[in-house]
Structure formats: structure tokens, C-alpha cells
Amino acid sequence: YCVYVRQANGCAQADNNEPERFWPNDLGPVTKDSLTTTDADRAVSELADYADKLLLVRGTRFGFPGNGCGHSGGGNQCLTAAKVSDTPSGNESLAMGESVDNRIALELNPAANPDPLTLYSGRMAGYINEVLSYRGPKDLRAADRNPWSVYTKIIGITDLPEEVIMKIKARRTSVNDLVREQMQALMSKPDLSGADKNRLQIHFDAIRDIEVELLCELPPADEIAAMEAQQGYDGADALIQTITKMQMNLIAFAFACDYTRVATLQIGDGNDGTQYTIDGVTLPRYHQISHRIFSDGDMGDPIPDAQGKHHVIDREHGKLFKHLLDRLSMYGTDVGTLLDDSVAIWCNDLGAGVSHTYKNIPWVCAGSCGGFLKTGQYVDAGDVTHNKFHNTILSAMGLTNPQGEYVDDFGDPELGPGVIAAMIA
């Protein structure tokens, strides 16, 4: 299984004379001790509990320039390693190839569900909305930011009468209750294997847990109203962490039930302008923080300690990513946990916000994909184009090239082929 979780606006790494605040101090082994001592001031230290399962990859770059908008061009290339369209251009530019999640879904997904799970959390301001998942050239896949909608698709109740769905919502009736007779008949079949029974039980047990989270009460109305008044719209910023965690829970659930083999989660829109509230403090708009000024352009008053605030947001994304790792670790398999059988990837569509660089794109991987990836390591890919990163992930997922060897041809054909050997166990 594979999931890409995308953060916007680059990370607070060394750039334009700013200090390093994202990566560990030294290449090589990553341990819980190092992340809680010498590297405790770095954003990746939020993942210290999973140090032995981490693979941190620096030294990759996008292969092509943007076309009038750094954010759009970065989003176009992030999961596609494809060129950016000539037309449309600017903030409307599109990728000229399929995305890695699309390739995985076509090769590995169950026949009943050929599409990747494409999720979203946060605002859609309209300037640049979805950026990640492509069926092919200029064919951008829409993302779902409604956890209830995603949930009903996963458990297959989208065709239920509206009154039944409303009953589930209003009365918190369990879906298990609605199909209990069918469940009992299925579980009692003599030809059902033990593994199938275990998978079904995981499915049934997880339903109630997710229902409780999906149907929980929102924060008090006065708190939401205060955020709405400050932000000027409907409270999406105040809920972004909550919705992100719900979507992550659904990704883990979908993997555990083999609903899909691959998912993407885009947090925030193309130039994420969320005002994050962290530890009770509401920060300026994230996009402006990444520019270091109170502006979405190149002129404005400086934001005090802007890189420090960017670092705080990086840490928040690290905490959210850890939540996903926690959820994937909840599900046991024959050889360990669902995380061990997967690779979860925290990524970005820029290297650093202040320069909008397409160099040194951060990839934070967790899970070895069944032992393929070399974990507990921080490696430098050597300034290669990031198609080689995706080739390595595709190979970890069991895909091959036409000769039966590691995938080496993902992305635009102008890019050099190959994998990143340092990532492979």
C-alpha cells in the first residue's frame, strides 16, 4: 500500500541564507535518540517514535520549469514527473502525464475500484485547487474533502435510500446494524478462510470507530464563529487538522479492507493560504509566511520570525503525518503492521517557500513496503530528478518495467531513467 500526503509552500530548510530547520544534522542512520537529542530542533523530530521505520530522502529536483506560476508548476510535477502544459498556463497549468498513484491503481487496485483514493482537506480558494492526481495529460482528478462522502463510498452505501443515510447520520445507527443478517450469513460460510474472516472482522470493527469520529460534534459554535469572523469565510481553517485526521483514518481503513492500494491526501490548496491555529495561536496565512511577508506577491511588510512560523507549521504537518502512522500501525498483519506492509510519504510541491525552488524536494517516507525500502536512514539522492524517487516507490510496490526489472521509466521520457539505489534495502 502507498499513500502520499502533500504539504504546500515548501519547508523551512536551508535556503536563501536561512538556517536548516527541517532535516536532521547528519546523513546516515536515523534513531529515536538522535531525533530527540541532536535533531530535536528539526521538524522531522516529530516522528521520533517511528525513527526505525523512516527513510528521509533529500537531493531530488523537479525536471522542468513552471509556466507562469511556481505553485501550479510544482503541483503539476509533484506526483507526475511530467512537463507543465504550455496551454493552459499560469495558475491554471496542468501536468502532461499521469501521476504515480494512477499508475499504482491501474496495476494493483481491485477490479471493482480501479481509481486511487483521492482526498483533500482544507480550503479551496479557487486560484489553484487540486494539484496531485492525474489520469493522464491535462486530466486532473478531483479530490473529495468530505469524510462522510468518502466513508460511504468505502463501505458501499452510496446507493442506499437517502432516508437510510439520514438515519445513520441523525440517529447514529451503525451500518453494521443495517446489514447484520447479511454479515452473520457471510461470516458463517464454511468456505470462508480464516484470513477472510479476520479481514471482514477488521472491516466491521472499524466501521463503528470511524462513524463515531465522523459524527462527532463540531467545536462550540462561538469558537467557530470567532474563527469565521477572523478569516472571513466558513471555518474551514479552524477544522483543517480535524478533517485531515479523519481523512487519514479513512485511508488506513481503506487499506486494511483492501478497498484500494494507493491514496493521496492534499492538505490545503495550491498555494495554501490557511491560517493555522497551533497551540492556541492563530498564525498569519501560510502562503504569506512562506513568502516571509504579509503579501502573496513579492512586496509587503515582513512577518516577524516568518521562518520560525514556517517551522511551526512544518512541525504541525509532522504531527499530522504521525497520526497517519499511528493509524496504519493499529492494523496487524501476518508479518507486523499495516505500516510495515506500506509506504507512507510526506511530500511537498516546492523545496522551500521563500525561493519557490524546485530543488531539494523533501520526501519523508515511513514503512518499508514489506522490506523493500531501507528504513532508519537519511539519504541524499545526489541532485537527481524526482522521477527516480517515484520509480523506486513503484518498484517497492511490486511493479516492474517490461523486462521484469525495477521500474525505470515513470514520468517524462526526457528524464534520465533509474531508481535511487540508496533507498533500497
Predicted segments with their positions:
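Ligand-binding pockets and gating/stacking loops
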Residues: 1-425
